[in-house]
From Swiss-Prot:
GO MF annotations in UniProt: glutathione transferase activity
Family to which the UniProt record says this protein belongs: Belongs to the GST superfamily. Pi family.
Expressing tissues: Expressed only in embryos. Not expressed in liver, lung, heart, kidney and ovary.
The name this protein goes by in its record: Glutathione S-transferase P 1
Binding site for glutathione: 8, 14, 39, 47, 54-55, 67-68
UniProt-listed Enzyme Commission number(s): 2.5.1.18
Description of how the protein assembles with itself and partners: Homodimer.
Provenance organism: Xenopus laevis
Length: 212
């Protein structure tokens, strides 16, 4: 197995779905932690080398990749987490894009609108969660994954953003039995469960705006 290096800030953020995938698949990786003040002040010289000036960065030997969803897809392709056929692959990409839409809305709330917009956000959240509940219902009556019989890279992304919303409001999934069971099922996977209990996971806040 090649040596993987994940470069990111000391938070969960956009790197967390990648970590969930690696942990669940039993793949070891090294964390290369970048201090947030050094990055945004330009003190950390790696910012000049970063494509789009953003993290996370993922390194697989000599190969370097940026953009969290591209990294997830790369790992999905490499480790058989992209579906069994073209139709499943297309559907997995669609779900992952839907997660990205929700993640961007969540990010705007946390970083820019939390004090004034949280109530409105939670009131409108069902309009987003309805989509994912419906997606689950169409695959084995919601008893499996977003697509097919095997976990995909999109599942790790969806799990993470759902956990973010449970942190935001513990009742955010209460009206969604399939999503609730889905989260419970995935966090019970032995290697995910082990990772979620680890010091490495729990020392990192969700974002810089969150307290540890």
């Amino acid at each position: 197995m090649p040596g993987y290096v994940l470069t990111y800030f000391p938070v969960r953020g956009r790197a967390e779905p990648i970590r969930l995938l690696l942990a669940d698949q039993g793949i070891s990786w090294k964390e290369d932690e970048v201090q947030i003040p050094d990055w945004f002040s330009g003190k950390d010289a790696r910012k000049k080398e970063a494509v789009f000036g953003q993290l996370p960065q993922f390194q697989d030997g000599d190969y370097v990749l940026y953009q969290s969803n591209s990294i997830l897809r790369y790992l999905g392709n490499k480790h058989g987490l992209t579906g069994a056929n073209d139709e499943e692959r297309g559907h997995i990409d669609m779900v992952n894009d839907g997660v990205e839409d929700l993640r961007q809305k969540y990010g705007r709330l946390i970083f820019f609108e939390y004090e004034t917009g949280k109530d409105k956000y939670l009131k409108e959240l069902p309009s987003q969660l309805d989509f994912f509940e419906r997606i689950l219902s169409k695959n084995a009556n919601g008893s499996k994954f977003v697509v097919g019989q095997k976990i995909s890279f999109a599942d790790y992304n969806l799990l993470d953003i759902l956990q973010c919303h449970l942190d935001l409001c513990s009742k955010s999934l209460s009206a969604y039995p399939l999503l609730t069971a889905y989260v419970e099922r995935l966090v019970a996977r032995p290697k995910i469960s082990e990772y979620l209990k680890s010091d490495a996971r729990n020392k990192r806040p969700i974002t810089p705006k969150h307290k540890k």
